[in-house]
């Protein structure tokens, strides 16, 4: 193992000088002697000098300090020992529950599976959330993005999906907290304990591994923590059981935008010219390296659900725009819908899914989904006429479209289990079968006689009918 010394420190970026014959390779991990600071080599500048990013705080470091090359990339513990534990970017435990006793350690930099290893699946993943199951269904082994600006409900939707899928899913989950709030990470950990997904008494009963690099941490941690979580998920996917099969793994990433942002923070310090809106010129490549590894193989699958922050609600911003290309389903959260008090604030016209195909989901589901979108789109077009001339100027057919669209809009709202503590309303899980039949009946005019208020924040259609009866008797 070669050793060198620090020659320059600028924030999170540190230059280290080695003998010309012992220059470390790109992505090699270096350790600053006498500290627990790890550096990752990013560039070779020539003359034996390498430029690195610190995985942790650079406070207390100074020029001349000795640095040792480990001769290998950053490796993290993988396997059963990670379940129930909270780890940092280097796989070190941060939950004060003792060391992570893992026999295997994998490098966080790995090749994506080759074309012949990959497998695609058309099996649907039921979420119990009406608007998602109907209009942007998820595929098992697919990649899903939750897009939204600040405060429209990305994390709440993510937590509800974890509640509805991970708790009912018999496989394993990995949660990567990338540059998000520590409070949310703490809440998530305690919720998982209450749900029995994390068993502190006996970690072998746990079903989820957690990797956190929160927003108070240096950019190096936030840049690599998504890769750490992904590596742990890949291990579960690729480890074969006695039948030669891997596991079906759920990977939750909150928030993929912070991964991009961490790259932006260090990009200028690494001497790269910024591109559009100040992002790093390597934005598409960095995103591709991460996303191409999140895939399903012949052995097992990774189903990934990623929250994506949208700066200033601009979906054309380079960061969310780059993410769009990699996803199978996009769930777009809208501030306009949130301002109407309709939650989840998912835009039914902007959200898309590759699964929305009659060959995959069946004719009935496809026709109902397109029928709902058609009614909502027509209502959107009529809104301007209503604002100028009023409802009376519309034809009878258009009036009927407006009444049905308003009922559909309200019926797309739903009380969440994770929001029970705030709203006091018990959460509802609605099966796909019930969702399709309910919306088909609304489109067919079966519930034209019910007031639109009855459709708001209801689970199934039976609840709507009961609410309408209650309103009638109260009136």
Swiss-Prot record:
This is ATP synthase subunit beta. The keyword Membrane applies. Keywords: ATP synthesis, ATP-binding, Cell inner membrane, Cell membrane, CF(1), Hydrogen ion transport, Ion transport, Membrane, Nucleotide-binding, Translocase, Transport. It is found in: Cell inner membrane. It comes from Psychrobacter sp. (strain PRwf-1). Transmembrane segments: none annotated. GO terms for molecular function: ATP binding; ATP hydrolysis activity; proton-transporting ATP synthase activity, rotational mechanism. The keyword Mitochondrion does not apply. It catalyses: ATP + H2O + 4 H(+)(in) = ADP + phosphate + 5 H(+)(out).
């Amino acid at each position: 193992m070669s050793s060198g010394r620090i020659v320059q420190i600028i924030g999170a970026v540190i230059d280290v000088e080695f003998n010309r014959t012992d220059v470390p390779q790109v992505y090699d991990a270096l350790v600053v002697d006498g500290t627990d600071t790890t550096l990752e080599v990013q560039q070779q500048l020539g003359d034996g000098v390498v430029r690195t990013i610190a995985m942790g705080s650079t406070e207390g470091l100074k020029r001349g300090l000795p640095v040792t090359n480990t001769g290998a990339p950053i490796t993290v513990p993988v396997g059963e020992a990670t379940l129930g534990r909270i780890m940092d970017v280097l796989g070190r435990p941060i939950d004060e529950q003792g060391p992570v006793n893992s026999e295997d350690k994998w490098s966080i930099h790995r090749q994506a599976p080759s074309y012949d290893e990959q497998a695609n699946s058309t099996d649907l993943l039921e979420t119990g959330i009406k608007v998602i199951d109907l209009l942007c269904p998820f595929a098992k082994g697919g990649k899903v993005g939750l897009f939204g600006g600040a405060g429209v409900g990305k994390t709440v939707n993510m937590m509800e999906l974890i509640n509805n899928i991970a708790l009912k899913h018999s496989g394993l989950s990995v949660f990567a907290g990338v540059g998000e709030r520590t409070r949310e990470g703490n809440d998530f950990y305690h919720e998982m304990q209450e749900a029995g997904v994390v068993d502190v008494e006996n970690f072998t009963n746990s079903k989820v591994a957690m990797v956190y690099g929160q927003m108070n941490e240096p950019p190096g941690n936030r840049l690599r923590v998504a890769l750490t979580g992904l590596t742990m998920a890949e291990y579960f996917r690729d480890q074969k059981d006695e039948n030669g099969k891997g596991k079906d793994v759920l990977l939750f990433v909150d928030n993929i935008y912070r991964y991009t942002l961490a790259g932006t923070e260090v990009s200028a310090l690494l001497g790269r010219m910024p591109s559009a809106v100040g992002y790093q010129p390597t934005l598409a490549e960095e995103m591709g390296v991460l996303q191409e590894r999140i895939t399903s193989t012949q052995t097992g699958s990774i189903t990934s659900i990623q929250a994506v922050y949208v700066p200033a609600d601009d979906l054309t911003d380079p960061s969310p725009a780059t993410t769009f290309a990699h996803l199978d389903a996009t769930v777009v959260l809208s501030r306009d819908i949130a301002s109407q008090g309709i939650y989840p604030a998912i835009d039914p016209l902007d959200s898309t899914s590759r699964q929305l195909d009659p060959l995959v989901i069946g004719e009935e589901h496809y026709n109902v989904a397109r029928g709902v979108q058609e009614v909502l789109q027509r209502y959107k077009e009529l809104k301007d006429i209503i604002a100028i001339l009023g409802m009376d100027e519309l034809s009878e057919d258009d009036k009927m479209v407006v009444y049905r669209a308003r009922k559909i809009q309200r019926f797309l709202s739903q009380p969440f289990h994770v929001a029970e503590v705030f709203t006091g309303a018990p959460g509802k899980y609605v099966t796909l079968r019930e969702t399709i039949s309910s919306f088909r009946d609304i489109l067919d005019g079966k519930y034209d006689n019910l007031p639109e208020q009855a459709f708001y924040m209801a689970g199934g259609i039976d609840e709507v009918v009961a609410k309408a009866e209650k309103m009638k008797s109260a009136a």
